[in-house]
Curated annotation (Swiss-Prot):
It comes from Natronomonas pharaonis (strain ATCC 35678 / DSM 2160 / CIP 103997 / JCM 8858 / NBRC 14720 / NCIMB 2260 / Gabara). This is Phosphoglycolate phosphatase. CDD domains: HAD_like, HAD_Pase. GO terms for molecular function: magnesium ion binding; phosphoglycolate phosphatase activity. Mg(2+) binds at residues 8, 10, 175, 179. Keywords: Carbohydrate metabolism, Hydrolase, Magnesium, Metal-binding. It is an enzyme of class 3 (hydrolase). GO terms for cellular component: cytosol.
Length: 226
């Protein structure tokens, strides 16, 4: 079965050392339908990946907070960037740190949410986020502070509308808590074997292989309809 594909980056297209497995490049390019890169990373990362793959710029960034579909030619923003900024300001004012050093390259281009290093205290971050009506999601790579009503499924709904398809037509592949809603909304959701409990619980199937090997396995299983 070939259908539109939505795929996460970290933990799904990568190896355990967090580098992208180059085998996924040709696999994505060969997929004979729409491919959407759906990530918690800020907008330049999925856009850059699409550019270097030579594929249409169909991206869900910042956990659904920023969406771009090339045929539509516009960026759609979901979420509350002012809320994320307020959480950052209050967290730092309380004596905590975002954890990315003097030059914060992680949040530099982030427009609708905030990412905090997982070595930083979580409890005060959650408390401050709650005060501002924001959620904190642990992706296994960072704590993401985002609008409570926005996630990758929100992004997929936007993408599907712009592409003229329905969300249930998609195959989705991911590994983390922030992929759970995406995996549930898609017609078929695969969690790779290294996925956390949230992603596993939301998926229709879990691959035997982990990381990029699991992604490649999921593509094979989707083609074979198994």
């Amino acid at each position: 079965m070939v259908a539109p594909l939505a795929v996460d980056i970290d933990g799904t297209l990568t190896r355990p050392d967090k580098s992208i497995d180059p085998r996924v490049f040709d696999a994505i390019r060969a997929w004979d339908d729409h491919v959407v890169i759906a990530t918690g990373k800020s907008f330049p990362y999925p856009v850059g990946l699409c550019e270097f793959l030579g594929m249409p710029l169909n991206v869900i960034a910042e956990n659904g907070g920023a969406v771009y579909v090339e045929p539509a030619g516009e960026v759609v923003y979901n979420g509350d960037p002012e809320g994320a900024a307020a959480v950052a300001e209050e967290y730092v004012a309380a004596g905590y740190d975002l954890g990315w050093g003097a030059v914060d390259m992680v949040n530099r281009w982030r427009e609708t949410e905030l990412a905090v290093d997982r070595d930083q205290p979580l409890e005060p971050l959650v408390a401050i986020a709650d005060d501002h009506g924001m959620d904190v999601v642990d992706t296994g790579y960072a704590y993401h502070v985002k609008d409570a009503g926005v996630d990758k499924a929100t992004g997929l709904e936007t993408v599907a509308e712009l592409l003229g398809v329905v969300p249930s037509s998609f195959i989705a592949i991911g590994d983390s808590e922030n992929d759970a809603e995406l995996l549930e909304l898609a017609g078929t959701g695969f969690a790779v074997a290294n996925a956390d409990a949230h992603a596993r619980g939301a998926a229709d199937a879990v691959t035997d292989a982990s990381f990029a090997d699991g992604f490649l396995e999921a593509l094979d299983r989707a083609r074979d309809n198994r």
